[in-house]
Structures are given as structure tokens and as C-alpha cells.
Amino acid sequence: VVSNDHAFKQAHRIGTVNSINWARIVAQVVYYFKGYFAATKTNNEQVSFAVPSGNFGNICAGHVARMMGLPIKHLILATNENDVLDEFFRTGVYRPRTTVETKHTSSPSMDISKASNFERFIFDLTDRNANQVTELWAEVDQGNPFDLSGTPLFAKIQDYGFISGSSNHPARIATIREIYQNYH
């Protein structure tokens, strides 16, 4: 695969715009603004966005839009059974899963064991303290969780407007069925 051939990529100056590339996040910020202006009549209304998320990429763009001043009340993070992010927002514990612990689900785009964009939010949460983020991620890179539950940082999370939840396969199917029956 070309994306894994580093010599070829360097020789031909090829890059990717995947979910961890800052250019993609910046591009996604735009549609939070577009969505806001499409959903509101005045510029002082607050909105909330619900975002299915495994890698924290799209919702990170929402976080950036909010930091830029877009009046977002809540960013609702929805995960599947691989609930690493939901666990963090509920408990303050970030515990990436091993490959063996990561479940294969009916929503495979969220079958993520370690959210590669999450570090960006933690950087903001720590008041952009690069040393603290480096220490936290050193633990993660060694396969250990980090726990912010007993710290002022955990209480500060609510200031960013995040709400989270997870679903399982039967709940997703029931929701799809209900929406189809009621709105088709």
C-alpha cells in the first residue's frame, strides 16, 4: 500500500489527510460553522452536536470550533461497545484497550482502542501544558491508563460542554428501526 511506502511517499511528496492530520480537523471545523448557521436564526443561539466518535477526530473539530467562539452548548460524544472515550468522560480514567480487548462491532468505524486525536483535547484541558500531556501519554504508550478523576482537571471537563454515551448492537438496531418506522 502506498501509504506505508515511506520512501515512495517522500520521493513523490505524497501525504495523507486521514483523521489524525491537522488539515482534516481544520476542514471539519468549517462544517460545524455551516451546521450552526443552517440551524439558527440569530448569532447568539446555542446549539448541540451529537457525533459518533471512536478516534475523536470529528468531535475534536467541534471542540476547536467551540474554542473559536462558536456557541456550542454540548458536544455529545457517542461511542459503541469500544467505550474508551465514554469511560473517560464519565470517570476521568483514560484506559486504551489492547487489540485483543477491542471488540468487532456493527459500527466498525468506532472500533477504536486508542483515540489518536484525544491528545489534542487533553492538551487544551491541561491549559496547553505540553510537559503534563507528555507525561500522561508516556503512561499510555507503556500500556497504562491515566486517571484524572481526583484532580481539578476532571471537574474542568464540564466547562468544555462534552457529554458522552455508548450504545450496543441491539440498541442501535432498535433506534434505526424506530427512526425508519416513524419518519420513512
Positions of predicted regions on the chain:
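PLP-dependent amino-acid enzyme catalytic core
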Residues: 1-184
